[in-house]
Amino acid sequence: MSETAVVEQPNDEVSTEKINASSVGDTIKSTELTADQKDKLEKLIGAVPEILKKTDNPKYDEIFGYCINVDTNEHVDVSIRNEILLKFLVADEYDVETAKTRLVNTLNWRNKFQPLSAAYEEEFDQELDQLGVITGNPDGNSNMKYVTWNLYGKLKNPKKVFQQYGGEGESKVGAKEGTQFLRWRIGIMEKSLSFADFTDPSNNKIAQVHDYNNVSMLRMDPNVKASTKQIISIFGANYPELLSVKFFINVPVFMGWVFSFLKKMGIISAETLKKFQVLSNGNLSEWFGKDNLPAEYNGGKSTKFSSLEALAEATPEHDIPVYAKIILAQTKDQVIEDTNLSVD
């Protein structure tokens, strides 16, 4: 039996209580909404019980570590829930029906893939720990306070990290979807989102840096290419309106065709492509300030940060969302139950 998270509700059925959406506009702090946009958000909020009923597991109501359910559910933070729903609505250009479908699909994906487990519970090959870090500066520019760094040039053993998570010998009970690399990469994304405050206009999105230094584009491992395509698809479908900017640095000039290809194939929307910054060097001083970066990323200037790792270590500590902890605990309990059943 594959592992799924089961979230306890007051009753066995999903609540059909009408959500109070009369003051939706007052709960949204991340942006100004028009009257029409507020009306559509109210409709999406009111459709939450319907959305949950349409999922494979109606009891699973978590997105980005927060509860997506009716107002009276004890785990719901109404403001955060509304901000998350707004991101889905914006991504689908305020088409309520399309946003509802996306939410159903995302809840199904999260229930099956378990991204919170990938972020906080699973252990990966040590090499993967060298491929990415999260850095933070609470005083940084708007929606660039927290950054995920992807350091592809440090990948030395692609065959190993692109194996199925857990290896071929892992029990089917509690087995996880995807390769080590995929689960690690999704986990980094989930961790970075825990630093965001969806109700703060200056910190409701994160930034990403993809460093291609020492990467041979012509001899890139086919597994890397396949996983990159898969990650782009997953992020596009399940992580809407969460990136403020995406830097591609130390990119060979001739690789510009990649971004034209992504746009032509419709893999990434034109709106998302506007957030891309493609640099043939690694100097990010213009966006983050030279004093907030190690020399390798600020044009060679000396700073208090000797390395990217030192910058990551300086990131303020924080706690993950309370509901994420609840989901993780219940997932563990479900694994134990499934294991006992398989033994019986």
From Swiss-Prot:
The keyword Protein biosynthesis does not apply. Keywords: Cytoplasm, Endoplasmic reticulum, Heme, Iron, Lipid transport, Membrane, Metal-binding, Microsome, Transport. It is found in: Cytoplasm; Endoplasmic reticulum membrane; Microsome membrane. This is Phosphatidylinositol transfer protein SFH5. PROSITE patterns: CRAL_TRIO. Belongs to the SFH5 family. One of its GO terms (biological process) is regulation of establishment of cell polarity. Heme binds at Y152, R185, H210, Y212, K246. It comes from Debaryomyces hansenii (strain ATCC 36239 / CBS 767 / BCRC 21394 / JCM 1990 / NBRC 0083 / IGC 2968) (Yeast). CDD domains: SEC14. The keyword DNA repair does not apply. Its cofactor is heme b. The gene is SFH5. Pfam families: CRAL_TRIO. GO terms for molecular function: heme binding; metal ion binding; phosphatidylinositol transfer activity. InterPro entries: CRAL-TRIO_dom, CRAL-TRIO_dom_sf, CRAL/TRIO_N_dom_sf, Sfh5.
